Amino acid sequence: RLQILSHKKSRFVFMKRIEIIKKAFLVLLVLPFLNTGCKSSSEEDFPSYIDAKKLRIFAREEVSTSFLNNVGEAYEEMFNDNSNIDSTMRSRYLSTSQDEYVYQRVGVDGMANNSNFDSGEPPLPYHGNVTDYIWEKNSADDGQIGEVIEHLLHTVTNVVFYLAYPNDWDYNDSYSAISLAMHEAIDKGIYDVSSYDDLKDDNDLYNKITTQEYAYWLILAEWNYFGITDKSMDGMSGNEEFIIGTPEEIDAQLPLGHQLYKDYVEKVLSIPNKQKIVSLF
């Protein structure tokens, strides 16, 4: 059993390293356009798209129509009504997403492995307000639910929350709510950021990705979604990078993180119905 756990741990670390490289690569492709202006855009890069809750979701040519539509449905599942929703905050979130032309990209798994991969640029006015890709997997058993939920939440927190609530979601402000909550988890040994050490030479990129991943793990735990996304390791509610994975543990051990969730996430998003998500992917 120790050998099995060691193998799973090694595989988790290996897959995490690959994921970090992909994230950094995609972010670095976007940053020059933010600083110097957009390259010539073409609808050929993203020949199809859908709109879901004021978010435009662009797809590369290879993406299946059914998968693109299901990604949109998964996002809409996060916006069901419940008694915790603050209508003013949700309205601000949605209007920011629309007015700032936030978008999500969808591609096919393996595309970014090509050394000549071009992340593409959607038609104007969509430009810059984006984070990473959602990849359509070859098999539903290959972590597809986790892939979709993770990268939608990256867009929610790292792009829309950052734009709509800059004081609390500014990842470059060490005193912002997101930064303080993340460091609470790091200081308590709950969030291990050592796998991101290679990014430290670029402070903006390091802050962007570490807070993005923290917010994702936090929400995943608050939603009790570690199981459905296949992100928990044997003998743990969480995993090697984020060791707790239930709302009760977040409440008990990460008061700043739990408050951040209560103040923003819970007031804007609903927990997606698990049966619905499973039916989509």
Which role fits each region the language model picked out?
Residues 31-47:
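Bacterial Sec-dependent N-terminal signal peptides
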Residues 1-14:
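Short, Lys/Arg-enriched N-terminal segments with co-localized hydrophobic residues
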Residues 16-25:
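Bacterial N-terminal signal peptides that target proteins for export
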